[in-house]
Amino acid sequence: MRYDPSLIEKKWQEFWKEHKSFKANEADDKPKYYVLDMFPYPSGAGLHVGHLIGYTATDIVARYKRAKGFSVLHPMGWDSFGLPAEQYAVRTGTHPRETTQKNIENFRKQLSAMGFSYDEGREFATSDPEYYRWTQKLFLLLYEKGLAYMADMAVNYCPELGTVLSNEEVENGLSIEGGYPVERRMLRQWILRITAYSDQLLEGLEGLDWPENVKQLQRNWIGKSEGALVRFKVNNQNFLEVFTTRPDTLCGVSFLVIAPEHPEVGQLIAEDRREEVEAYICRAQSKSERDRISESKIKSGVFTGTYAKHPITGADIPIWVSDYVILGYGSGVVMGVPAHDERDREFAETFSLPIYEVLDTDGYCIHSNHGDFLLDGLWGREAQDYVIAYLQKKNLGESKVAYKLRDWLFSRQRYWGEPIPIIHFEDGTCRPLEDDELPLLPPEIQDYRPEGFGQGPLAKVKEWVDIHDKKTNRQGRRETHTMPQWAGSCWYYLRFCDALNSQAPWSNEKEKYWMPVDLYIGGAEHAVLHLLYSRFWHRVFYDAGMVSTPEPFKKLINQGLVLATSYRIPGKGYVYPEDAHEDNGVWMSTSGEELEVRQEKMSKSKLNGVDPQILIEEFGADALRMYAMFSGPLDKNKLWCNQGVSGCRRFLNRFYELVTSSLVQDIDDPKGMYLAHRLVHRVGEDIEKMSLNTIPSSFMEFINEFVKLDIYPKSALAMVVRALAPIAPHISEELWTILGNAPGIDQAGWPEVDPKYLEDTSVTFVIQVNGKLRARLDISKNAAREEVLSLAREAVSRYLEDKEVKKEIFVPNRLVNFVL
């Protein structure tokens, strides 16, 4: 029999679909396991093999847990709102819905070809009205709890894209999407009050089985700092409040720096300095916050011409404006202590400001006694507490906790996003839509370009925007901003628990059964924002009594990047691998230009993506799945090599030939059972530990040992086929039936490992005739002498035929020698 994956894989994919083999059920008599991928944005480029690493890992776990008797939820859906589809609509006039649906169909086809065991009945897209009806409802929950509000904000506005961008979507003054110029402008926006949950989001990290670097990134993003708020008197009447985490260095202050957007900055500018300062502020407004706080940026600033009084020494402290200070953190004013802060030192040296040493090399306070302020000799927490107590007594400050985390700018000036379900009235009030008014659908439009600054495409459709509100009998105006792509992905994991519910986003019963997500796998690029936003929404739901767990994701794994060889003409761009060739050790393009050859992240832009469909057609999905794991540890970067897929295909060919061999018999063989039980034990342990890259090697080692047997015990191979099923499910299903079992290997369960077989109880006897090696036999260690001699005579019978055996030499567990 010949192994033909093109026939086998199609056959079993149709079987699984017909029998709904992976439908998840809430079974009270089974433990549950919820394994989830970070669902993809369905781009026009489709999937490359780099995307499949995480999907293959979750599928292996899902199939393994089903076999172990768990009720498994393993769904897939589509994060389908987003800017690329809208930009394509602007260029072509094609409705984003059409583009998105076409892309989803392509993604679905690619994933299906891999044999992933998704519960297809739970699939949805965030752009489905049946889904975003509930996204709108959940936004209104935030609104009702005072966690969604409108405010005038300095935003990153991209005229070319016609929308506001988050700080993470801007780099070096340009949009990451398209590389267009970005400006800072004031705009009235919807904001989510994520800062209300700062402490809960911090504390919740402690109990999570997440990579420590991800938890640290979130801690840093939230940025909790304990310190003091210090008041510096300005113009003998007003105070400028400064937050510091190091009040013990207060006497080392030689300047103050205020953020350009601080509301009091205008009052601090001396008239003879106004033109220069305002010009600087104007320039600062064109920069993104990321660019402003970059460590590598040369410090810039301008003196306001105004001084503040030091609260301890009474010295005049110059007030400067600099764009490295951000209004949203602390008070928007920092005290410059250049002797003990590297950033302050750079600023002081740039502008020739004084530097005062107030800590010795061991951190003890020096040069800090002034009148009744006696700080010298104190250290660390004791020194800080002394300063705070002194300031409180003099009404010049108090202790304070500050956070870097700022409220979440939520609205976007786009068409392809969830409409925000709010009606505004002329008197400044607004009304949230009621349940019977949801989902609020966007109007059908022909022109997807923005209306102008602060107005998305929806603002053009006057008949949709301007309405008579029947609920209040008033003239109103619909909100024309839409939600960001983050909105739909903040809660999708909950919808999968109850995807067909038309009465609520999920039922309490099903949420309680499935949550939390037991294993969540996705890219490290989502380490902060998606995970933080999802945790925030989940905490709100928890406080509202809507979910049973305070945290959504129990265990998180970030899969590593998949690298592939890229070829680039310096100064021009990338070329396809098929347009590159090596000539005397130098890589050249077909146009005759020398190439830079690198190992880079697989991506469409670098022309080094590998289409999985091509590999499936050549080698089969099972070989691709196996190599996807064999290529390296799940959480590490790995270099892709198509030859590795070919190697896995050769292994599967060999395994297929082994199981279908005429040597397979219904016998009990200790060595064969030992090899099978040892393999199953190893594979189970490796899946539990997520050491998936070592599994293919274990199977290869098994085959190399197993083929040495004279007869292949069928029961041992049945165990091994079941153990292979999570990794290579199609060939396993086929071989399972060839061995005489009913279809549906998942239902057969995970093979039980008998501890007695984990120790190799067989030994290899050397069988000699007149001292010459004639055979080797694997025989049980416990076999009696006569049993061994009987087996040995049978093995070398042709050498003994018609001969007289004069002597039988027997060495236990080692040797039999027949002397003629």
Curated annotation (Swiss-Prot):
- The entry marks the following residues as binding ATP, namely K604
Q: Where is this motif: 'KMSKS' region?
A: 601-605
InterPro entries in the cross-refs: aa-tRNA-synth_I_CS, Leu-tRNA-ligase, Leu_tRNA-synth_edit, M/V/L/I-tRNA-synth_anticd-bd, Methionyl/Leucyl_tRNA_Synth, Rossmann-like_a/b/a_fold, tRNAsynth_Ia_anticodon-bd, Val/Leu/Ile-tRNA-synth_edit
Q: Where is this motif: 'HIGH' region?
A: 40-51
Q: A GO biological process this protein is involved in?
A: leucyl-tRNA aminoacylation
Q: What is its EC number?
A: 6.1.1.4
Q: Does the keyword Cell cycle apply?
A: no
What is the designated name of this protein? Leucine--tRNA ligase
Q: State the organism named in the record.
A: Chlamydia felis (strain Fe/C-56)
Query: Encoded by which gene?
Result: leuS
